[in-house]
């Protein structure tokens, strides 16, 4: 009876070798070496070929449905869900969301991300891109302790897509300020803000150190032209000067990077967030920065850290508690500070406003002396000299010049008369 079994090239070679063993042309050991199998497997194949002919070298599962076979209806359901709900998701992220949505309901088993990627490629929902050859840069090992180094940056993006618009229906680009711990990869703090200016950054770090304590160091870039000239930027030109001073005041070491690649971890994280966070907020119906900040704190960051953070090389938290001096000067530390000269009439001009210093002050003030103007985050203005806060009042308009002015302001009124027991009287100056 003719054997009409169709064999592959490898199966045909295997059959020829086994037949050579059967007619004693070669020995079993030689056949095992040629085929790359054991002598015991050759003996089994000899029995199979004697009993079944050419079919004996064919794998018994050939042509049968795999135990891991996925029903075509499941494939169609998955692709339909991706088309309607997860149309712009990457395969891995789409698989995660499908598992969250369907695995708990036991409706059908969600395949692996590799299978979903293959299906999306076949249906045109995803196109695998070739990796570009990257410029060589040496790898920097992670810090060993949690809190040893915080990478900080901001990213302008349409985080709320077409759900957050201005009065003219234009899309609003929002800045996400974010810090990530270098040792663990955890997002330690994140806030949506209008811009990456001094007020927004100070508000961020004031909240950070209140919640977490003071890290040993903060790593950030010297701001690019794009960020400084961004349409939403307010006071970015002054940011580095103010931020360096504030970090020095509370003993946090500031490290500046001179390229985006130097802060690779946080740059890659922003790329991930511009994909994942945007879509998570879309699914959750988050439409404004206020809703987004609550979503970050309560849902997204805990879930993200649980999924993507790593175990640090050393256990322990190197964040430091705020000292009593830190707490005492907290508002002053996180204030925008500027220097101004005292005019001859003891007025001070600042941002189109005029302030009159009152006659009695906690320290002596002379004309042309330099004072420090502090703009606190609550919007109030404080004028200080030699560590003392001066007493002042906001004038309704620019003061008119007057002829007579007091020479100095002191801790008492200028027409003050010394008492009888004052040392000045005792030495004959009566």
Task: Show where each model-derived region lies.
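Short, Lys/Arg-enriched anionic-surface-contact patches
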Residues: 1-15, 65-73
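Short, amphipathic alpha-helical "recognition" segments used to contact nucleic acids or chromatin
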Residues: 9-26, 75-85
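Short alpha-helical "recognition helix" segments of helix-turn-helix
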Residues: 29-35, 94
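Basic, flexible linker segments flanking DNA-binding modules
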Residues: 54-159, 238, 317-325
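Mobile-element integrase/transposase regions
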Residues: 104, 118-187, 194, 198-216, ...
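Acidic/histidine-rich, metal-coordinating catalytic segments
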Residues: 209-235, 258-260
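Charged alpha-helix within mobile-element recombinases
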Residues: 236, 242-313, 318-331
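C-terminal, beta-rich DNA-binding module of retroviral/retroelements integrases
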Residues: 301-430
């Amino acid at each position: 009876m003719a054997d009409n079994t169709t064999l592959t090239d490898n199966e045909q070679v295997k059959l020829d070798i086994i037949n050579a063993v059967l007619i004693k042309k070669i020995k079993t050991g030689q056949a095992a070496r040629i085929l790359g199998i054991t002598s015991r497997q050759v003996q089994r194949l000899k029995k199979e070929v004697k009993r079944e002919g050419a079919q004996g070298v064919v794998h018994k599962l050939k042509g049968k449905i795999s135990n891991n076979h996925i029903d075509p209806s499941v494939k169609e359901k998955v692709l339909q869900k991706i088309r309607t709900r997860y149309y712009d998701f990457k395969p891995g992220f789409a698989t995660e969301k499908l598992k969250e949505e369907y695995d708990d309901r036991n409706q059908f088993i969600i395949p692996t991300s590799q299978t979903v990627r293959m299906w999306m490629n076949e249906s045109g929902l995803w196109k695998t891109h070739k990796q570009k050859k990257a410029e060589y840069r040496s790898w920097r090992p992670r810090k060993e302790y949690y809190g040893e180094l915080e990478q900080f940056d901001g990213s302008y993006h349409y985080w709320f897509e077409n759900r957050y618009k201005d009065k003219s229906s234009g899309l609003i680009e929002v800045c996400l300020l974010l810090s990530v711990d270098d040792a663990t990869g955890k997002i330690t703090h994140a806030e949506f803000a209008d811009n990456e200016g001094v007020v927004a950054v100070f508000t961020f770090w004031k909240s950070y150190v209140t919640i977490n304590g003071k890290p040993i160091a903060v790593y950030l870039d010297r701001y690019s032209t794009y960020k400084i000239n961004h349409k939403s930027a307010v006071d970015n030109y002054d940011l580095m000067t103010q931020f360096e001073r504030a970090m020095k005041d509370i003993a946090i070491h500031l490290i500046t990077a001179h390229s985006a690649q130097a802060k690779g971890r946080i740059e890659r994280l922003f790329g991930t967030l511009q994909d994942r966070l945007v879509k998570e907020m879309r699914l959750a119906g988050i439409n404004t920065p206020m809703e987004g900040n609550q979503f970050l704190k309560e849902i997204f960051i805990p879930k993200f850290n649980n999924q993507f953070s790593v175990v640090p090389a050393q256990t322990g938290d190197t964040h430091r508690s705020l000292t009593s001096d830190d707490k005492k000067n907290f508002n002053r530390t996180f204030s925008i500070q500027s220097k101004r000269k005292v005019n001859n009439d003891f007025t001070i001009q600042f941002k189109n406003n005029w302030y009159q210093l009152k006659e009695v002050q906690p320290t002596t003030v002379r004309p042309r002396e330099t004072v420090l103007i502090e703009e606190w985050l609550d919007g109030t203005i404080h004028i200080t000299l030699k560590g003392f806060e001066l007493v002042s009042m906001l004038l309704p308009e620019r003061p008119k010049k007057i002829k007579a002015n007091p020479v100095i302001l002191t801790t008492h009124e200028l027409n003050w008369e010394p008492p009888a027991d004052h040392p000045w009287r005792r030495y004959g100056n009566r």
